[in-house]
């Protein structure tokens, strides 16, 4: 028996939820998923609490909710669809529950006021452009796991700061079309944190983002400067290690 109950845009409008500034968890209790585009372009929404009955947030579910500042995501959500919170300019922080396993492409793209992201250890897939254009991110918190990955940084690339000085990882940028081993073989897609302009110390490389040839002047692998990989050479990081504290 299928007990799925989707909160669709039609239901949102029928219940008058599209007219509210604050939506509490009891208003959504009993639904199992927030459907595609359910609250998209709801310009007056400032706060929403997603109850534990919800297991998934659909594509474009909250796209361009430009006044949204506060999100509480219940402890049953396992997936966030593509563009789910795209261009929610006013969000300042995100804490994802330990049940989340995947974040879709462009999910938090354009959240300009976002300064902190908490990514739990349950995450197995962060899709391309998931946090693109988040120019004010200062802290990324990764769950309590140590990851060993392979990455390739191309020679003609634009360097963006990513994470902070304590992180041993260098280059949160992955070669397109490949799957990288991380614990139980999760997949991290190309440019997961592309265009995070103001992050600290660790570079996120992107090939030709503005059509200009920006040379890599210094690359650090496992926290040690690699003199051999200056200039136009291809940079291959043998190991990326992500610690278990604020990075």
Region spans (language model):
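N-terminal capping/linker segments that flank leucine-rich repeat
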Residues: 1-37, 50, 136-179, 184-192, ...
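Structural signature of tandem-repeat unit edges
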Residues: 1-6, 14-33, 43-56, 66-79, ...
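Consensus positions within tandem repeat domains that build extended binding/scaffold surfaces
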Residues: 11, 35-40, 58-63, 81-86, ...
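Intrinsically disordered, low-complexity, compositionally biased regions/tails
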Residues: 20, 39-41, 62-64, 78, ...
